[in-house]
Amino acid sequence: AFGKHTAIPHHNSDNTPLRNGDIILIDMGMKYKGYCSDMTRMIFTKNPTEKQKEIYDLVLKAQKAGIKKIRAGITGKKADKFTRSIIEKAGYGEKYGHAGGHGIGLDIHEQPSLAETYKKPLKENSIITVEPGIYLEGEFGIRIEDMLLITKNGNRNLTKITSDL
């Protein structure tokens, strides 16, 4: 998605042309030997506005906070709260719009879910995504998504592409 369509978390493509200055949200993955991958990155075709940079930095801060704390044994609900609480404290809680992440494996979306409703613990050696986002209707949206291997004492980020602007 690009331009104002980035404010729609799962936008279906249409015939809208890309314009100079549009931001681009790329949610991508592939399958390898039957297993899925998933990541999201933002591309700015011009220098971001102050508001775009503020939102980007906030989403990245939330994601990094979640990644720092996620480990085996915590619930999906608690994992979601690690990212969501930062966005809520900044006043954008209602603009989050989806779960904080999901399990991934043979299917692109599997259990566990990083969501308010998921009260089971994350299991060691499972793969999840952490994907906070803020979506400002009619303007733009920002989402950053990485895949993590859950370990006993933390996690290992499997996404090797930078999330720097």
Language-model-detected regions and their locations in the chain:
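Active-site neighborhoods and metal-handling regions in enzymes and metal-associated proteins
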Residues: 1-165
